[in-house]
Amino acid sequence: MGKVERFVADPEYKPNGGEVASIETSKGTVKVELFGRECPLTVGNFVELAQAGFYDALAFHARKEGSVIVGGCPTTRNMPPNQVYMAAHGGIYGVHPGTGEAEHRIKDEWEGNPLNKHLDGSIVMARKSAPDSASCQFYFSLSGQPEFDDKFTVFGRTVEGLDVVHALRVGDRIERIVIEGPTA
């Protein structure tokens, strides 16, 4: 039987635009201002997953130098860094970091979003090649990449720890994500 897909059309968490995600990694902490007013579905989804501990102990599983560092795939949960690296490069048969997702998908929110700019330090919801297929994986943009502005939802920007973002490598871990702000 095929996988049942559902969209998070209306996450329970309603962003107010004042949320900040404190992403604690094995390399240090990154603080990200979330764009809750501009992309409420994406931020609501991210906040709910973070508050449920979904991202705890996941690894960053892909890096394209000067472009992106990708994390949030549940396939990497508790995998040692060397295994994440080996699996990401095809060295472990049957383990494919980057293919895992939460039990739902969400709609894209880049269209009409004036803040949807891939700048150095932007946090972006990753998705499959199909529209409206984002779930839980995200990436940090490591440079300006306007060619992606109309393809992926940018849901925040790094306000502290850009040096940490640039230091992240495949196998580095998300220890936990804490949401701060007036309604967190």
Task: Show where each model-derived region lies.
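Cyclophilin-like peptidyl-prolyl cis-trans isomerases
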Residues: 1-184
